[in-house]
């Protein structure tokens, strides 16, 4: 009887030791796995040093306008224009019979030039009693599309003013050597040239842009990106990027917004998608869009949030900051 009791006691102790050893081994293994995971995985913070943007080739509407306005930007350099006009006006020499040219030259040099705004250079086309000592140097724009430049208009205005001064001086109505007369004419010409220089087209920001970026030190896999985009209704198409059409599944319907790779050249090569990875995606919508801009923007925002949730990323605004309620209101004000 005593042997049976001793046997049960030993069996119970053995079972307790085995259970304790199993629990201790499982706890140690679990602790080791979690310790390695947290030590190797970087903190989940958004990427702040993104330098890429929507490739110009993927924005055909604004790309042509930017190329066409490149020449006008070079031609309307305010500092260069102002310096040329000031030097040209100081070098005007008017000779009338019976008048000392040296005395008049000193008065012209003392005459102030009104330059509150950039003034356009002068190119007179006649030779009466007005002579230029030097020919001002002009910068030819790389692209010229305007039929009549502001420089030609300002030149015509200044030529008419000088001709009017000569006519009045010949009739004795005004003293052409009077400092007050010269100041009045120069101020009048400067004001007219300023009004011409201010007539410049203002480019409007006609694109809504949102970013989906991976956490710091991580990237999105290409096959996951394609799978998530197709699940959200995107279709692979023109420019080798994905588009969201007005009617889901109908590629013939108008495109509402698109998504491109954030890294240059911004495309998705489906033949190498298994080896593809990226730090982020850019979603953009042109304004005005097909249909209602507010409704399309809300659809874009909802799609962006769903995409970020599916990929485990973050949504950034056009300034590459975390998209918050202030960003939402700012975007809604733009599309309203």
Curated annotation (Swiss-Prot):
The keyword Ribonucleoprotein does not apply. Its main location: membrane. SMART domains: ZipA_C. Pfam families: ZipA_C. SUPFAM superfamilies: Cell-division protein ZipA, C-terminal domain (SSF64383). InterPro entries: Cell_div_ZipA, ZipA_FtsZ-bd_C, ZipA_FtsZ-bd_C_sf. Keywords: Cell cycle, Cell division, Cell inner membrane, Cell membrane, Membrane, Transmembrane, Transmembrane helix. The chain crosses the membrane at residues 3-23. The keyword NADP does not apply. It comes from the Bacteria. Residues 24-336 are cytoplasmic. It is a single-pass type I membrane protein. Residues 59-70 have a biased composition (Polar residues). Residues 1-2 are periplasmic. Essential cell division protein that stabilizes the FtsZ protofilaments by cross-linking them and that serves as a cytoplasmic membrane anchor for the Z ring. Also required for the recruitment to the septal ring of downstream cell division proteins. Belongs to the ZipA family. Interacts with FtsZ via their C-terminal domains. This is Cell division protein ZipA. It comes from Actinobacillus pleuropneumoniae serotype 7 (strain AP76).
